[in-house]
Amino acid sequence: MIVLGIETSCDETSVAILSDGKILSNVVSSQIDIHKKFGGVVPEIAARHHLSNLPIVFKNAIDMANISIDQIDLISVTYGPGLIGALLVGISFAKGLSLRLGKPLIGVNHIVGHVFANYITYPHLKPPYIVLMVSGGHTEILLVKQDDEIEVLGKTVDDAAGEAFDKVARILGLGYPGGPEIDKLSKNGDENKFNFPRPMMDSKSYNFSFSGLKTAVLYTVQKFDKDNVPKEDIAASFQKAVVEILLKKTFKAAKDLNVNTIVLAGGVAANSYLRKKAQKLSEKQNIKVLIPPLEFCTDNAAMIAMAGYKLYKKGISSDSTLEAVPNLKI
């Protein structure tokens, strides 16, 4: 089965083609440089660029896969969560293509896409497994019981982890996006220099909170003269606190539920410190941890195509009434 995936939920325009779960093409056009000067994604600008980029990215994906559009068997598209204007561009394109080709359409939850990105690298992965889903907009611990049955065990009660990274990067005067900037800066810092709070880390629930940690960083920065802020040490200490919170909760969930596999998903899963610490804990606690390659952590259409492929095989599909749902939940 040849599946076309379309992803336009935020600031990446992406089209991918999979054949029975194997990637034939995965083209991503990023808008990071466009939004960098604004310090974040501007929804209207993002939507306009999706509109102009999508036909070009689509053609490139078809050419790279070396197929004709008539060979496409299924069209899979992100319908939420995300920016309403950006989502509508992808959905409208997918609907038009489905109508033109007479091929089935399936709407995919962007978060489920991130989870299912792991099937690309780990095709033998089977439920049940625990997911640490960490991105700019979402931080959740999920239990995948079946491909079409995912339970939210815990989530952030305020900022997402990626959002906290961006806000702390801004406090430190770093560029956008903040996650990679802090990751890079931390490599030259002392992670034990500042003992930042770990909100909710020892609570019985699997929920997270990062706003208090972010505020603690702000107060610490304000104690220093503007030109003498130890940015490397603050970044490293902050990053350590976030990762400890994330991993303690996730491994607790795996132990409590007697699930022996944890997978990482989402943009923050690209963080080198998180990846390293997750691997170390895996060996220490004898729980398997699967970490996606960097290109499948950030937004891409291959993950949407894979999710569509898996769910369509479960008998799930959409029709022409498919609409964008900006605040879509799992």
Swiss-Prot record:
EC number(s) stated in the UniProt entry for this protein: 2.3.1.234
The cofactors it requires, by name, are:
Fe(2+)
Which residues are involved in binding Fe cation? H110, H114, D299
Say which enzyme class the record assigns.
Answer: transferase
Task: List GO BP terms, alphabetically.
Answer: tRNA threonylcarbamoyladenosine modification
SUPFAM superfamilies from the UniProt entry? Actin-like ATPase domain
Among InterPro entries, the record links this protein to: ATPase_NBD, Gcp-like_dom, KAE1/TsaD, Peptidase_M22_CS, TsaD
Give any GO molecular function from the UniProt entry: N(6)-L-threonylcarbamoyladenine synthase activity
Q: Which domain of life is it from?
A: Bacteria
Q: Name one GO cellular component term.
A: cytoplasm
**Protein residues bound to substrate:** M133, V134, S135, G136, G137, D166, G179, D183, N271
Location comes to: Cytoplasm
Q: What is the documented function of this protein? A: Required for the formation of a threonylcarbamoyl group on adenosine at position 37 (t(6)A37) in tRNAs that read codons beginning with adenine. Is involved in the transfer of the threonylcarbamoyl moiety of threonylcarbamoyl-AMP (TC-AMP) to the N6 group of A37, together with TsaE and TsaB. TsaD likely plays a direct catalytic role in this reaction.
- PANTHER family attached to this UniProt entry: TRNA N6-ADENOSINE THREONYLCARBAMOYLTRANSFERASE, TRNA N6-ADENOSINE THREONYLCARBAMOYLTRANSFERASE, MITOCHONDRIAL
Q: Which family does it belong to?
A: Belongs to the KAE1 / TsaD family.
HAMAP family per record:
TsaD
* Protein name, as recorded: tRNA N6-adenosine threonylcarbamoyltransferase
Source organism per UniProt: Thermosipho africanus (strain TCF52B)
